[in-house]
Design a protein with these regions (language model features):
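Long, charge-rich, low-complexity alpha-helical segments
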Residues: 3-9, 55-140, 166
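Radical SAM/AdoMet-radical enzyme domain recognition
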Residues: 155, 166-187, 194-300
Length: 384
């Protein structure tokens, strides 16, 4: 009788999640299209799967289990047997589900210009509402310097006077990777002013990290310079658009001609809000797919919702959560002080001197990423 009760109890007990941790897979050298996978399993059974160091997939527990079996090189039959046993489902159904997952991910592996962050069978807000082992993204402000001719007061140069060296930033990238942070973004100021930007991108690529750059530099209009960044391993780009400068539009055009996931950011003020629809039309003509919006004054803020709707009408997808580089188009005085839901949890922001903030504009120092233990920084972020 006791044995029967145990069997009944076991049948209805929830499936225990797989052990949390990092797992890696490299396809065989003779594979038709070589690829590499990095899987981070969370304590609650969810996970993130990094495809070719270029796309982060957020996975629910079932998808995370399929990914785990895949990176462990299980055959479909072995995977189906394991899933059927753990979830008490028919083995044929388990095989169909596993095969479907693999096919969907393989399709993503073959897709160009893919959104760098994708939520597979996951509501986009779910990952930001739970406890996770490490942030999903590290925003690295390489410098608060601005291009010649821009007012330095648009960036917090008085508060942060020092810049880390390339060696220091490489140590930070390594430390972030060891902590399980899969995605890094280089921002500023103007990150393109750092001559070592291509080398830092290459270092992140070597680690396996997804890497993006946020910039408003006219240098992005140079196909040769953009190719240098791409060849270094750049995965996605956000162009900070100044609609009144043709060199800014040239940067958008060059980025759209490259094999690169590109978002265009527009910071609204009263003047730009009045011209918002014509700007959206020009972006659509340039075949821009992704748009980021913010406001620098009250009039711009009033028009945000309307312009979001107009953007959606034109088929533009809205991107959220990325920091916008300090510049004349995004003045520091307009930064909000209240942290967003993902601040300190889903992402962290590193200033040019290595100090860590919950996010851009929230000036509460959690420690220094270069000199302080990661565990200390993470604990302070959790107790915000």
């Amino acid at each position: 009788m006791a044995s029967l009760i145990r069997k009944i109890r076991n049948r209805f007990q929830p499936v225990a999640p797989l052990p949390a941790g990092m797992h890696h897979y490299q396809s065989p050298p003779d594979a038709p299209a070589p690829y590499r996978l990095h899987l981070r399993l969370e304590p609650d059974g969810t996970g993130i799967l990094i495809l070719n160091a270029s796309t982060v997939l957020h996975l629910n527990p079932t998808a995370a289990e399929c990914a785990y079996l895949w990176v462990k090189d299980s055959t479909p039959d072995q995977a189906a047997k394991t899933i059927a046993s753990r979830y008490r489902v028919d083995r044929k159904q388990a095989l169909r589900d596993y095969t479907d997952f693999i096919q969907r991910v393989e399709t993503l592996l073959r897709t160009t210009d893919l959104d760098p962050v994708t939520f597979l069978d996951f509501d986009r807000h779910d990952p930001y509402s739970k406890e996770i082992s490490a942030p999903y993204r590290l925003d690295c402000a390489l410098t608060y310097r601005l291009p010649e001719g821009e007012n330095v007061h648009y960036a917090p140069t008085e508060r942060v006077k020092n810049e880390l060296t390339a060696d220091d930033w490489e140590k930070i990238l390594d430390k972030a990777w060891a902590a399980g942070i899969p995605h890094v973004v280089f921002t500023g100021g103007e990150p393109v002013l750092r001559d070592d930007l291509p080398a830092l991108i290459a270092h992140a690529e070597k680690n396996g990290q997804v890497c993006g750059v946020l910039s408003g530099s006219p240098r992005l209009g140079s196909a040769d310079y953009l190719k240098t960044l791409l060849d270094s391993g750049l995965d996605h780009l956000m162009v900070l658009l100044n609609p009144d400068r043709e060199e800014s539009w040239a940067a958008v055009k060059t980025a759209m001609q490259a094999d690169l996931a590109t978002t265009v950011h527009l910071t609204l003020n009263a003047d730009l809000a009045a011209r918002g629809e014509s700007i959206l039309d020009r972006l659509r003509q340039a075949e821009v797919k992704w748009l980021s919006l913010s406001a620098s004054d009250a009039d711009g803020a009033k028009c945000l919702v309307t312009l979001r709707d107009r953007a959606a009408d034109r088929g533009l997808s809205l991107q959220w959560d990325l920091p916008v580089p300090y510049s004349s188009a995004n003045p520091v005085s307009q930064e909000i002080g209240a942290p967003s839901s993902g601040a300190g949890k889903a992402w962290l922001y590193v200033e040019p001197d290595g100090d860590v903030l919950p996010e851009q504009g929230v000036n509460r120092v959690l420690g220094n990423f270069l000199s302080d233990p990661w565990e200390t920084i993470r604990e302070k972020a959790r107790t915000k």
